[in-house]
């Protein structure tokens, strides 16, 4: 399939239009601000797919309606999905602003004394507020000289945070969520809400019955040569763990091989359904070759599939990872049990960071007292106040083992363009593939089993839908924790030792839902959550504001919270502001 062009960032240099000396004296400085902004973004950021970001600068500085319209015409023809307006001087507020109501927009007003860039910033933001088109304000903390072309650190932070979030918004627009199956075991997140996807994310929902997956497997609607490559890769890289099934449920070698083959086929077919595959067109299967333009997907599995066929654990784990038999590549976003709301949290995290996401059950809160009672050992270090056991049946991205390394040699999860083949191999080597427990999965399957290395910063998120309110976002920054082996083995065995585990310690604030670890668990809005690498809660907050999704729980420092300027007019408490502003403006794509 032909790739749909990626959204670009438009840079709008605006200027005082008075000729005979004023405009002429500002042209170079204004255009240099635009060029510096574009250079910063292209150097520091990439699309989630790894492609370089393109910035489009207006052909001329913008002084009024005519040049603003010319700029808009250029942007419309080049798929600009985000705009940043820059100026070092006074300009004519409402005459020069970006009026597209669905495009994220920011204004950087240069903090200098020679010309009043701050005055234009304030005037333009007032126009945005009055017209109901929110914009983000960027204004440096310290005064700069007029000939200073550097971008201060605080301005850079806001430019990049805005650009990351804005591109996420633009990248999701027009894509689809592929719902394979329906509601899994009554899980509310798998009651896929079309209005949420359409109104808040600008996406469609493609609903496909699981029989379509069955048809593709049975009728060989896949690349048969790729299947052989996938099987050979699995034979080389898969380490098999203990089969904990009773003797009557253990499978022989031939049966196990059939389960592995079908598990790999599920991964291939779900991928093809998401993004298409030209190899199918070569087989005369043109319709199937197109895919569904899906940027995220979910697979129901339980129980209508898994009571008879291999579960989705292997397929989901491999798709969500940054590598497979084709080498290192962009991870997909595939939600276990078709939990579309957790899938959206995964999608947001992937778009912001370019990394794989760890889907998990928020399974158990272990208090220090309970751990010591069960193991005879105290929790220490990051775990001293208690831990949350994040574990599911084996569909978490294998990157979650954290066998990749950052520039300082510390364990991490990296965007795929930074991952070496050796790091991918290390993640595979850290993973065991355990036969699925028959009582859970009568059709068999393999669950990935790994343990996340400790001391790694993570952000846990979840989207929930509240009747009468709409979607809300939860955020909990914290760290993975490494427990003594004997302690881990004892605690892990009490749940299911054939599944992947992350021991998570949220950062506590002593207030509200972050009073203690128990409160974090008690306030979590659903049975699932997502781990995104790094302390990136501030990026999630900015993105949520763009989409008009209020944040109902977070432990991000107030100084890092960055929302549109109009939020400040919705009260003095910043979280109440968020709720009132999101309600006032409504969903980004409201109809």
Swiss-Prot record:
Pathway: Carbohydrate degradation; L-fucose degradation; L-lactaldehyde and glycerone phosphate from L-fucose: step 1/3. InterPro entries: Fuc/Ara_isomerase_C, Fuc_iso_dom3_sf, Fuc_isomerase_C, Fucose_iso_dom1_sf, Fucose_iso_N1, Fucose_isomerase, Fucose_isomerase_dom2_sf, Fucose_isomerase_N/cen_sf. It is found in: Cytoplasm. It comes from the Bacteria. GO terms for cellular component: cytoplasm. Its EC number is 5.3.1.25. GO terms for molecular function: arabinose isomerase activity; L-fucose isomerase activity; manganese ion binding. Keywords: Carbohydrate metabolism, Cytoplasm, Fucose metabolism, Isomerase, Manganese, Metal-binding. Mn(2+) binds at residues 337, 361, 528. GO terms for biological process: D-arabinose catabolic process; L-fucose catabolic process. Converts the aldose L-fucose into the corresponding ketose L-fuculose. Homohexamer. This is L-fucose isomerase. It comes from Citrobacter koseri (strain ATCC BAA-895 / CDC 4225-83 / SGSC4696). The gene is fucI.
């Amino acid at each position: 399939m032909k790739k749909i062009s990626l959204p670009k960032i438009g840079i709008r240099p605006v200027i005082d239009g008075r000729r005979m000396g004023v405009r002429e004296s500002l042209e170079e400085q204004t255009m240099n601000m635009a060029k510096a902004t574009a250079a910063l973004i292209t150097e520091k950021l990439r699309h989630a797919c790894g492609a370089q970001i393109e910035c489009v600068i207006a052909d001329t500085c913008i002084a009024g309606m005519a040049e603003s319209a010319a700029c808009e015409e250029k942007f419309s023809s080049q798929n600009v999905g985000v705009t940043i307006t820059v100026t070092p001087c006074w300009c004519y507020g409402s005459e020069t602003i970006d009026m597209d109501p669905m495009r994220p927009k920011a204004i950087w007003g240069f903090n200098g004394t020679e010309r009043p860039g701050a005055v234009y910033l304030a005037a333009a933001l007032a126009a945005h507020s009055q017209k109901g088109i929110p914009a983000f304000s960027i204004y440096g903390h310290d005064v700069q000289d007029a000939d200073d072309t550097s971008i201060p650190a605080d301005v850079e932070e806001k430019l990049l945070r805005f650009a990351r979030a804005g591109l996420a918004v633009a990248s999701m627009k027009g894509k689809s969520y592929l719902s394979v199956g329906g509601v899994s075991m009554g899980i509310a997140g798998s009651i896929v809400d079309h209005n949420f996807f359409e109104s808040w994310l600008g996406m469609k929902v493609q609903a496909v019955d699981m029989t379509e997956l069955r048809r593709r497997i049975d009728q060989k609607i896949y690349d048969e040569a790729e299947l052989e490559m996938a099987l050979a890769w699995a034979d080389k890289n898969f380490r098999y763990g203990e089969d904990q099934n009773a003797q009557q449920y253990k499978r022989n070698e031939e049966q196990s091989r059939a389960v592995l083959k079908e598990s790999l086929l599920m991964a291939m077919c779900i991928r093809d359904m998401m993004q298409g595959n030209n190899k199918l067109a070569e087989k005369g299967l043109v319709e199937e070759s197109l895919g569904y333009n899906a940027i995220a997907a979910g697979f129901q599995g339980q129980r209508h599939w898994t009571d008879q066929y291999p579960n989705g654990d292997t397929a989901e784990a491999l798709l969500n990872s940054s590598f497979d038999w084709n080498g290192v590549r962009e991870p997909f976003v595939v939600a276990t049990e078709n939990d579309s709301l957790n899938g959206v949290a995964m999608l947001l995290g992937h778009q912001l960071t370019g990394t794989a996401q760890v889907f998990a059950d928020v399974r158990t809160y272990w208090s220090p007292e309970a751990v010591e009672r069960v193991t005879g050992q105290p929790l220490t270090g990051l775990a001293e106040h208690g831990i949350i056991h994040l574990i599911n049946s084996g569909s978490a991205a294998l990157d979650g083992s954290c066998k990749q390394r950052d520039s300082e040699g510390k364990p991490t999860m990296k965007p795929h363009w930074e991952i070496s083949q050796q790091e991918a191999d290390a993640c595979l080597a850290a993973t065991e593939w355990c036969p699925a427990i028959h009582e859970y999965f009568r059709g068999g399957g393999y669950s990935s089993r790994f343990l996340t290395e400790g001391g790694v910063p993570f952000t846990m998120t979840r989207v929930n839908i509240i009747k009468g309110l709409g979607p809300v976002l939860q955020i909990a920054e914290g760290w993975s924790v490494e427990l003594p082996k004997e302690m881990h083995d004892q605690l892990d065995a009490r749940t299911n030792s054939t599944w992947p585990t992350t021991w998570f310690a949220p950062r506590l604030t002593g207030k509200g839902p972050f009073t203690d670890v128990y409160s974090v668990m008690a306030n979590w809005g659903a049975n699932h959550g997502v781990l995104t690498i790094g302390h990136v809660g501030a990026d999630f907050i900015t993105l949520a504001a763009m989409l008009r999704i209020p944040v109902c729980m977070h432990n991000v420092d107030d100084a890092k919270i960055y929302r549109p300027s109009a939020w400040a007019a919705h009260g003095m408490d910043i979280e109440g502001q968020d709720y009132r502003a999101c309600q006032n403006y409504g969903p980004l794509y409201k109809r």
